[in-house]
Every structure is written in structure tokens, then in C-alpha cells.
Amino acid sequence: MTLQEEIIRQLGVKASIDPQEEIRKAVDFLKAYLRKHSFLKTYVLGISGGQDSTLAGKLAQMAIAELREEASDQAYQFIAVRLPYGVQADEADAQKALAFIAPDQTLTINIKAAVDGQVEALQAAGVEISDFNKGNIKARQRMISQYAIAGQMAGAVIGTDHAAENITGFFTKFGDGGADILPLFRLNKRQGKALLKVLGADAALYEKVPTADLEDQKPGLADEVALGVTYQDIDDYLEGKLISKVAQATIEKWWHKGQHKRHLPITIFDDFWK
């Protein structure tokens, strides 16, 4: 088995999908998790205005709406959370995403004071924080807020990790990579876009340039620039297609580099890192 085949196997990616079938599969998955854990009544998800959180949010709201009706239990709620750092440049996109999702509840927590306070505390201790590292603090602070909300509201936190993100390790360890449930896992970027099209999302929500937008000194830095490879190449690779040797080497480099992010903390019994 080639490395490409092994990665595809691990991430469960199909070469082609039926968007309607994948929507139903994700909604049923989200419903089943709450049914199994009867002490949970809500899903919590940060909404940025990008493709991934828009799709995960819509699927979550659909699942909660069905559960609420089927169980005749109004306690089932989907809580969308806006988590800007100061003023978000593409706030209009975030509002457009919320209008499309139509969540039961929307909360806004501005993380700027918490992030800046942490950076200042570290600097006071003599630890200078790089702009890149500060970006990771932002991602982790967003998850602190989401878990605080979930803890108070009998909730589980939804993550937006999908195959094109997982293969490159393009997420913050214990930041956006930390969640309870991943409804998009198995889908690549273009497949997620296909689901949003079927769901009737505004094209602007899935045609915009993907960006983590975590660094102050590189606002709106495109994912593809940061990774050095296009999502088209990543998606093609995940669908078992041939791509250029340069693109393949870049993708596989990120796969190896990000292995530690796909595991729980390393124990003496683990050998994946050796």
C-alpha cells in the first residue's frame, strides 16, 4: 500500500460522493451522539464566516431541529458563537453565514482582551511571543470559550476538521483541533463545497479564499500560500488521483510533520513518532 492509499484509508475519503447522502449521514451522526449521551442537550460551534464552520453549523442546526421535534424536547439547542479578535475584517461574511444557518442561539465573545492579557502576562515573565505563536493563542482561546459555554449548557463542541485540513495538519493543536465531534471528517474541500451548494448556501460563503486569519502581521493569509500547495492538488491527492511530484511531496511532508496533532499525548507505548 502506498502512502497515498494509506492516508486515504485513514481519513475515509471517497473519490466521489452523493452530497445529499453525505448531508444525511452527518445529520444522523450528530443526532445519534446526543441520543447516546442523554445528559447532553446542545451543540456549540464557533462561526467564522468561512466554508467549514458554515457547513458544520448548518448540519448541526438541522440535526438539533430534527431531535427537538422527534423528542418533543425544547432543551435541544444549537449555539453558534462568534469569536472575533477585536473587529473581524470579514464580519459581513460571518453575519451572512449566521443568516444561512439560522441557529437557535447566537453568542458573541470578543477574545481580544483574553488573548492580549495572556501575551502581556507572558511578556512580563520574560517570554516574548511571536506573531505566529500569538495566532495559536487566539485559536486556543476560542476553544476555551466554546468549552466554557458547552460546560454551562450541557453541550458538546463541534469541530470543523475535514480531510483536506487533517492531511496537512493545518489546525492548532488543542485549539481548533480540539473538539468533541467532527461531522466533516472524511470530506475534502471540494466535497464540502458540494454539500453547501446542495444546502442552498450563498456562493460567497464557499467561493471565498480560505484563510485561518490568525496572524496580526499577515492578515487574511491564504491557506494555500501558507501551505505551499493548492486545495485542488490536496483534494485530487485525497481522491487517489495523480498530481505533480512537487505537490505530492509537499502534502506528504505536511502529513508527517502533523502526525503528533492526530494523536492523544504520547505515552511510552506509542511508536508512531519514532
UniProtKB/Swiss-Prot annotation:
Organism: Streptococcus pyogenes serotype M1
Ranges in coiled-coil conformation: none
Keywords: ATP-binding, Ligase, Magnesium, Metal-binding, NAD, Nucleotide-binding
Top-level taxon: Bacteria
Similarity comment: Belongs to the NAD synthetase family.
InterPro entries assigned to the protein according to its UniProt record, in alphabetical order: NAD/GMP_synthase, NAD_synthase, NH(3)-dep_NAD(+)_synth, Rossmann-like_a/b/a_fold
HAMAP family associated with the record: NadE_ammonia_dep
One Gene Ontology term from the biological process aspect of the record: NAD biosynthetic process
Protein name stated in the entry: NH(3)-dependent NAD(+) synthetase
Catalytic activity, as annotated: deamido-NAD(+) + NH4(+) + ATP = AMP + diphosphate + NAD(+) + H(+)
Sites where the protein binds Mg(2+): D52, E165
Organism lineage string: Bacteria, Bacillati, Bacillota, Bacilli, Lactobacillales
GO molecular function: ATP binding; glutaminase activity; metal ion binding; NAD+ synthase (glutamine-hydrolyzing) activity; NAD+ synthase activity
Quaternary state and interactors: Homodimer.
UniProt: deamido-NAD(+) binding residues: R140, K173, D180, H260, K261
Gene Ontology, cellular component aspect: cytoplasm
